[in-house]
C-alpha cells in the first residue's frame, strides 16, 4: 500500500501523462515478479515502453537491481519489446505496400498480366499513360520504336529543329529507372532489344519512351514506380515458379525489417550485361540487325552475302577446316551450313552412298559453289539484294589454284559501325564489321575537332612521340572533383585524347602476341579517328566479377599466368602498359586472356633513362605502385604491382583499398601501405602477392621471374 501511495504521490507530481504511463511499468514488473524495484524505476523516470526496452546491465545495477536472476528476467522481458516492435514495423510496411499496390494509372489496369510476357512490352509515355506493345518479329531497336510511334498521340510526338512533327526513330529515346541508385538509365539499342525479347526481365514492363528533346516527366516516373511495385506484388503471388524473377528483382532494403521485398543492387549491371560482356560472335551472327541498328539493311545483307562467299572460296582454296574461334561472319555461317550438310550425308543409307557417290569427294561436298549457296542465302534471308545488282561470280574457275591468300587482316577500307560495347582510356569502343570480309572488330573511336591533327601512320614519328607527349600528358585517370571546366582546358584534353589514340596505334603496330589484342589498322573518316582492333567475345575481368562474383583460386592462377605472359612480352618490347587493371584484361569465351587499352602506355628508350625529369602520374589510382604515386621512377616494375592488384580484384571482387576514396588511396600508397592480402588465399598465393607488392621496385621481381613462382604451377593439374 505504501508503494502504491508513493507511486500515486509521484504520479501527481509528474502530471497526467505519467499517470497514464505508470500502469505499464507496474504491469511490466509485476509480470516478472520484480515489483520491489518500482520506486527506483519511477525515480529515474523509466516508466514507458520506449525507455524500458533500452535497459542494459549497467543501468539495472545503477537502479539497485543487484540480483543476477532479477537482472536476467528484466533484460529478457525488455528485449522482447524490441522484437515486437520490429514485427509491428514489418506489418506496417506490408500494409503500406498493399496500399501502394492498390494504386492504378488512369489508362492501364495493373494486375497479374504484369508478369513478363514473351512478346509484350509496356512503354510509359511522358503524360503518365502506358501502352502495351507486341514486339514479336521486331529484332532491332528501330523496328520496336516504329511499332510504338505509330500508336503515339499527336501531342507526344517529337518535333525537329524546324518545329515540325517527326516520327523518325532516331528522335526518340528509351529510359529505364534504376531503383538501386535512383537514377534514370538511357538504354543502348542492343540493351533495348535484349530486354524486350527476354522472358525474365521485369524491366520490360516499365520502359519510359520520350522524344530526344525531353526527359522523363514526374508523371512517367511515378507510373514506373507503381508498375514496378505492382509487378513485384504479382510475382510474389504466383508462387515458386517466379522465385528466380523475385530473386533478381528484390528491392528497397530496410535494415530494421525482415522478410520483405528488396531491389537487387545488381539490377543496373544486369541491364548492361550485353554491353559489358561482349557477346559471342555466333550470337551476333544470329541478330546482326540488332547489333548494327543504324546500318542500312541492304548494305548489311550484301556484306553477309559477300562474306559467306569469301569464306567458301578461301575454305576450298586452302583446303582448311573452319576455325571454331573465327570472328568472321562468313566463316560462322559457312560452318553452320557445313555442319548441316555433314549431318545429312551421315544420315544417308551407306549402300546408296557407295553406289552413287565417290566417297573421296564427300568432304568437298560440304563446300558448295556460290550458285549452290544461293539456297542457303535464301534461308538466311539474304536475297533481298536484287539479283541484277550482283551476279554470281565463278570463284572456282581456271585460276582457283593460284589464289593469293592474305597473311594477315588488312585495314578495312569500308566498315559497318554497330552498337557501343565499352570505353577505353580515351573515347568509346564500338562493334564493327569489315564490309568486305564480314570480320567482326572492336573499333576504338575519338571525335576529331576541326583544329585537331589527323592520323599519322609514319613509323618514323614514333621515336619522339613519347618525349613530345610527356610534358603535355594529363593525369587523365585521376578524377579532380573540384576542377572547373574551361574551354581551353577541354580543348587541350580533347587534343590529348587524339594524341593518345595515335600513340596507342603506333604501339600496337609492333605487338603480335596471343595475349595482346590484335591491331588491324587505323583510319580517319567522318570527323573521327578510328583504331580497328581484334573483337574479343566474352568480357573483361571487371565485368565478370560484377556478374559472377570473386573467382576460385584455380581460375585466378590461370588468368594471372596469362596476364604475366602478356606483360613479359610487352616488357621484352620495352613497353610499359601503365594501366593494368581488371577492366583492361579481356577474357574470351575460350578463357584466353587479352590485354587491351594502350592509351597511356610508354615505350622505354635510352633517352628515358638519361632524363632527370620527374616521372608523370599516369594510370588508375587504386592499381598504382608507390613509385608511380611518388612520381619517382618510370619502370616496368609498375606493371607487376598492378598485376598484383588485379589478383586482389579476382580474389575479392573489389579493387585494392575499396573503403577509401582516390585521394585517400594515393595517400595510403604514397606512405608505403600495401593492399590487404586475402586471408583465404593459399600460402603460395599470399607469397606471390607479397613479392608483387614489394615496396622497393628495384627488388620487385619481373614478369619472367614471377612466372616461375610455385603458385602459378600449383593448379595446372
Swiss-Prot record:
<comment type="subunit">
    <text>Homodimer. Interacts (via SAM domain) with STE50 (via SAM domain).</text>
</comment>
<protein>
    <recommendedName>
        <fullName>Serine/threonine-protein kinase STE11</fullName>
        <ecNumber>2.7.11.25</ecNumber>
    </recommendedName>
</protein>
<feature type="modified residue" description="Phosphoserine">
    <location>
        <position position="323"/>
    </location>
</feature>
<feature type="active site" description="Proton acceptor">
    <location>
        <position position="579"/>
    </location>
</feature>
<feature type="domain" description="Protein kinase">
    <location>
        <begin position="415"/>
        <end position="712"/>
    </location>
</feature>
<dbReference type="InterPro" id="IPR001660">
    <property type="entry name" value="SAM"/>
</dbReference>
<dbReference type="InterPro" id="IPR029458">
    <property type="entry name" value="Ras-bd_By2"/>
</dbReference>
<dbReference type="GO" id="GO:0005524">
    <property type="term" value="F:ATP binding"/>
</dbReference>
<dbReference type="InterPro" id="IPR008271">
    <property type="entry name" value="Ser/Thr_kinase_AS"/>
</dbReference>
<comment type="function">
    <text>Serine/threonine protein kinase required for cell-type-specific transcription and signal transduction in yeast. It is thought that it phosphorylates the STE7 protein kinase which itself, phosphorylates the FUS3 and or KSS1 kinases.</text>
</comment>
<dbReference type="GO" id="GO:0106310">
    <property type="term" value="F:protein serine kinase activity"/>
</dbReference>
<keyword id="KW-0723">Serine/threonine-protein kinase</keyword>
<feature type="compositionally biased region" description="Polar residues">
    <location>
        <begin position="453"/>
        <end position="466"/>
    </location>
</feature>
<keyword id="KW-0418">Kinase</keyword>
<dbReference type="Pfam" id="PF14847">
    <property type="entry name" value="Ras_bdg_2"/>
</dbReference>
<dbReference type="Pfam" id="PF00069">
    <property type="entry name" value="Pkinase"/>
</dbReference>
<keyword id="KW-0808">Transferase</keyword>
<dbReference type="InterPro" id="IPR013761">
    <property type="entry name" value="SAM/pointed_sf"/>
</dbReference>
<feature type="binding site">
    <location>
        <begin position="421"/>
        <end position="429"/>
    </location>
    <ligand>
        <name>ATP</name>
    </ligand>
</feature>
<dbReference type="GO" id="GO:0004709">
    <property type="term" value="F:MAP kinase kinase kinase activity"/>
</dbReference>
<feature type="modified residue" description="Phosphoserine">
    <location>
        <position position="465"/>
    </location>
</feature>
<keyword id="KW-0597">Phosphoprotein</keyword>
<keyword id="KW-0547">Nucleotide-binding</keyword>
<dbReference type="InterPro" id="IPR000719">
    <property type="entry name" value="Prot_kinase_dom"/>
</dbReference>
<dbReference type="GO" id="GO:0019236">
    <property type="term" value="P:response to pheromone"/>
</dbReference>
<feature type="region of interest" description="Disordered">
    <location>
        <begin position="453"/>
        <end position="479"/>
    </location>
</feature>
<feature type="domain" description="SAM">
    <location>
        <begin position="20"/>
        <end position="84"/>
    </location>
</feature>
<keyword id="KW-0589">Pheromone response</keyword>
<comment type="similarity">
    <text>Belongs to the protein kinase superfamily. STE Ser/Thr protein kinase family. MAP kinase kinase kinase subfamily.</text>
</comment>
<feature type="binding site">
    <location>
        <position position="444"/>
    </location>
    <ligand>
        <name>ATP</name>
    </ligand>
</feature>
<dbReference type="Pfam" id="PF07647">
    <property type="entry name" value="SAM_2"/>
</dbReference>
<dbReference type="InterPro" id="IPR017441">
    <property type="entry name" value="Protein_kinase_ATP_BS"/>
</dbReference>
<dbReference type="InterPro" id="IPR011009">
    <property type="entry name" value="Kinase-like_dom_sf"/>
</dbReference>
<keyword id="KW-0067">ATP-binding</keyword>
